[in-house]
């Protein structure tokens, strides 16, 4: 990989960064950064930068990060490994388990394997099967209300990201029974309080290949009153174990393969192109305050790039051929790899913009999703629809990384100028999305128009947790609004 050049921040950029940190600070869970125009650089340069920072007395609030941490769930991967879950729960000392699933997965073989495994080991369990696809705050609260009187000592999630995220929050709020729902929700929509004690064991059995939620400390849902998608991010939410059994993804419809895979794609691309960890401020005064989303780092890079390679190679096959077990298996592995990558490096604009896209849905119902006739923009679709626009915009922040990504899509970049890196990657992404078939070619296809742009921008602004990792995005809010308006307009069609 070509070593990028670091551009030193100007005094104005540092001032803008400080202003943004003050405006959007939300405690220890909030990753933030300095000049968004910084380029990635190799580890040696980062070490020298840290030495200079440590040697120079400065305001601690403005000190940049000098370290990164890697955290992920334990993962077991292999066809048929679901049958071991009963032994896992027994090994964890669980006496009573809440099994969390949804109305569709409860009928599938994955749940049959779970029930048989728990019963065989004599582990008491109760099933909650009312999880909503793309959870709302009220559906999360219903799940928490179900869990509280059960006095369970472990949770077992069987399903896609919606199920796993719901189980994480059931675990959290039963462990903190006196907490208000907004206490742990990411600021500024919630209070962003830290999680101050370990939670109960949670084992996750994913049945989709997309969110990577089995490896991360993030749970996402719609905050209906604010017309915003938000969530809670903390290492304490991470599942104790992720059981990744490729057999469980064989029942996914083609549309779900596509949408889930697009989430993997953007997890990989966004974490690969996020600001580097050593440009994030403020440096935590205590390591326990280091956020889950820290910026790109040499270890997350490995996971993110491999996830991108696998997704480009195997997602089209998994979508086109329901009997391509190799492609399905590789996509489940890619989702897990990307989960480790973005679970530590973070995501940025595609995800930040996706939250208002899905929560402000003007009435679009994605083909292949059976949710009782309710309008739905699947998460992966809402993320990917802006991707060509986003990476055209971020290309100048680090041309080398954008060209490296374009090369994975099969682009010959040997004669491409660095100034064209964003355009080249954006074009490669658009071509890939069209090739998958049945994907909306921009926001217009979802029912959005120019008249919706301002509301979409206002729904994106509060997503400070991810926007602060976005390269090229201004730290000054009025300028940021204009940049986001341009991004949404550009994303209307591709």
Each PLM stretch: what is its role?
Residues 3-8, 13-53, 405-494:
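C-terminal charged capping/lid subdomain of soluble metabolic enzymes
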Residues 31-154, 443:
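ATP/NTP phosphate-donor binding region
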Residues 151-170, 207-214:
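Glycine/serine-rich anion-binding loops at beta->alpha junctions
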